């Protein structure tokens, strides 16, 4: 499995709604609210044959209330 993170900027007043919809979709392993330019941080795992860009475009960015995303692809985990 390949891990990656997505920072999510929500429409005003929609962060809890987006977080709940993301949790209900059961596609993220972890979802956090954050301070700063983005409202949420979600961790995902996909199989090595899955295109991360298509996954984010099809499964994450289509959730109502999301205004913008930033995908962070990781290389090596030093601790878990």
Regions found by a protein language model. Give the residues of each.
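A compositional/biophysical signature of low hydrophobicity enriched in polar/charged and small residues
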Residues: 1-80
């Amino acid at each position: 499995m390949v891990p990656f993170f997505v920072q999510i900027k929500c429409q005003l007043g929609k962060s809890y709604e987006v977080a709940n919809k993301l949790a209900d979709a059961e596609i993220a392993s972890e979802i956090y609210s954050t301070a700063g330019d983005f409202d949420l941080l979600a961790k995902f795992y996909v199989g090595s044959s899955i295109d991360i860009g298509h996954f984010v475009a099809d499964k994450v960015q289509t959730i109502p209330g999301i205004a913008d995303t930033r995908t962070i692809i990781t290389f090596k985990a030093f601790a878990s």
